[in-house]
């Protein structure tokens, strides 16, 4: 396998690239260091990879890089580059989401139509493509009705992947990630904010009553799903990738208190536009096709993120 990983300096991209390199895969990584969160964090994510012989890094946007040269001998593409964040996707900033999530994906898909060596393109989609009225657990064939502009952009890119499969036989596989957490998690994400505030003794903002639930998925399980999809994923298909259980924010706060041995201080804020009330993945299709099953439970994974963040702060 010779892989291209887009968004390689990010939370999931860097973790995936490290696993691939450890498995002996030749990896080219591309990232543009968007300013959504501080560049030094992404540089730390890359530090270990840059010392590896099986890894080469290119700093560029997908729209600007010479894709023909970048893809020349690649057999697999993992497309994780995206503009993240539900709450920032409203208003004028939506142009950034269309540019980085939709336009960049279409440009990449167009480029790989000229790649006879391509075995799989694995696209990082999101549970945000579902809506609040979706029956739980969410199945891949449920109606998609995003409640945020971010979700709309991810669904549009997912649809582009299917169109390029249907019309050009590009072997795309899309993975709908459910709330990914673990070491290197972005600073705007819930667990990172909760853990950091608890470590520093600061209040945690909880939006609403805290009874909203999520299907939390550890980053190494997401990495395993990507690798399985690159080998066994059925081209044209979409798979849910979840952690296997619904947990409320209040339950998470209790667990953080036990892990940190310090009771979190909570400040209740109003519910934010675009936040889904509940998410829960039906992963039976991924289990059947990819042999996917989550291996890291919430307490184990949250402890790993706590230890990483505690070391980063100190």
Tell me the role of every PLM-derived stretch.
Residues 108, 157, 161, 194, ...:
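Aromatic/hydrophobic pocket-lining residues that form π-stacking "cages" and hydrophobic walls in ligand
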Residues 93, 175, 187-188, 235:
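Active-site loop immediately N-terminal to the catalytic Tyr-X3-Lys motif
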Residues 136, 187-195:
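A glycine/serine/threonine-rich, flexible loop-to-helix segment
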Residues 82-88, 126-129, 179-185, 211, ...:
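Active-site proximal helix/loop that lines the substrate pocket
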Residues 11, 123, 130, 178-181, ...:
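Conserved hydrophobic/aromatic "anchor" residues
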Residues 89, 178-179, 238-241:
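Short-chain dehydrogenase/reductase
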Residues 1-176, 220, 296:
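N-terminal Rossmann-like NAD(P)+-binding domain of SDR-like oxidoreductases, especially those catalyzing
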Residues 16, 198-314:
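C-terminal substrate-binding subdomain of Rossmann-fold SDR/epimerase-dehydratase oxidoreductases
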């Amino acid at each position: 396998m010779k892989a291209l990983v887009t968004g390689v300096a990010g939370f999931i991209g860097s973790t995936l690239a490290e696993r691939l390199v450890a498995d002996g895969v030749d990896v080219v990584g591309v990232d543009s260091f968007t300013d959504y969160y501080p560049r030094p964090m992404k540089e730390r994510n890359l530090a270990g990879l840059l010392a590896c012989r099986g890894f080469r890094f290119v700093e560029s946007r997908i729209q600007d890089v010479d894709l023909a040269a970048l893809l020349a001998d690649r057999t697999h593409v993992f497309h994780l580059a995206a503009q993240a964040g539900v709450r920032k996707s409203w208003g004028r900033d939506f142009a950034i989401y269309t540019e980085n999530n939709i336009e960049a994906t279409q440009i990449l898909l167009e480029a790989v139509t000229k790649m006879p060596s391509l075995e799989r393109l694995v696209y990082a989609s999101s549970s945000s493509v579902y809506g609040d009225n979706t029956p739980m657990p969410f199945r891949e064939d449920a109606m998609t009705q995003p409640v945020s502009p971010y979700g709309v952009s991810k669904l549009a890119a997912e649809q582009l992947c299917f169109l390029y499969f249907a019309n050009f036989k590009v072997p795309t596989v899309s993975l709908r990630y459910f709330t990914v957490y673990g070491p290197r998690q972005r600073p705007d994400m819930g667990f990172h904010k909760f853990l950091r505030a608890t470590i520093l003794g600061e209040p945690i903002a909880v939006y609403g009553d805290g009874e909203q639930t999520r299907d939390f998925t550890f980053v190494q399980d997401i990495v395993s799903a990507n690798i399985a999809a690159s080998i066994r994923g059925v081209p044209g298909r979409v798979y849910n990738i979840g952690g296997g259980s619904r947990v409320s924010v209040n339950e998470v706060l209790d667990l953080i208190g036990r892990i940190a041995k310090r009771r979190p201080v909570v400040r209740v804020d109003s519910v934010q536009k675009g936040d889904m009330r509940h998410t829960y993945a039906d992963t039976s299709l991924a289990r059947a096709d990819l042999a996917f099953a989550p291996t890291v439970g919430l307490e184990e994974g949250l402890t790993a993120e706590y230890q990483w963040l505690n070391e980063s702060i100190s």
